[in-house]
């Protein structure tokens, strides 16, 4: 399972010209599910995302996590993160999870974060989405479990 996280001052996702999810300070999480992913991996990754210290403390050091800064999550499914780009000029998605598997783990990821008390907005699984963000830093990390 892959989470590309970006520290943002704001982010939103639009489907069919309607904003369906938006946050201010927090993390935009682009979430990719791979074939071998499980609920255990999802919980490990969600915990890491929520606990990852990517926000600056009073000394300007990345030392604070999402909860410590009162931040939110915007979680957007993105199967292209599971692409194999090692050969040729076209990505292969053979390692990506099936749509049913990916939807289940995406929904469980969101529910897990919400159950931990984190304000969590979402995109729409499988939809054509327009994602807007102001990357704060820029700060972007690729987390995998």
Curated annotation (Swiss-Prot):
GO molecular function: D-tyrosyl-tRNA(Tyr) deacylase activity; Gly-tRNA(Ala) deacylase activity; Ser(Gly)-tRNA(Ala) hydrolase activity; tRNA binding
Domain of life: Bacteria
Main location: cytoplasm
InterPro entries: Daa-tRNA_deacyls_DTD, DTD-like_sf
Gene Ontology CC annotations of this record: cytoplasm
Pfam families per the UniProt record, alphabetical: Tyr_Deacylase
Motif mapping: Gly-cisPro motif, important for rejection of L-amino acids: 137-138
Location(s) in or outside the cell: Cytoplasm
Catalyzed chemical reaction(s): glycyl-tRNA(Ala) + H2O = tRNA(Ala) + glycine + H(+); a D-aminoacyl-tRNA + H2O = a tRNA + a D-alpha-amino acid + H(+)
EC number: 3.1.1.96
GO BP field: D-amino acid catabolic process
Keywords: Cytoplasm, Hydrolase, RNA-binding, tRNA-binding
Catalytic class of the enzyme: hydrolase
Protein family membership: Belongs to the DTD family.
Complexes and interactors: Homodimer.
Function (record text): An aminoacyl-tRNA editing enzyme that deacylates mischarged D-aminoacyl-tRNAs. Also deacylates mischarged glycyl-tRNA(Ala), protecting cells against glycine mischarging by AlaRS. Acts via tRNA-based rather than protein-based catalysis; rejects L-amino acids rather than detecting D-amino acids in the active site. By recycling D-aminoacyl-tRNA to D-amino acids and free tRNA molecules, this enzyme counteracts the toxicity associated with the formation of D-aminoacyl-tRNA entities in vivo and helps enforce protein L-homochirality.
Protein name (record): D-aminoacyl-tRNA deacylase
Organism: Shewanella baltica (strain OS195)
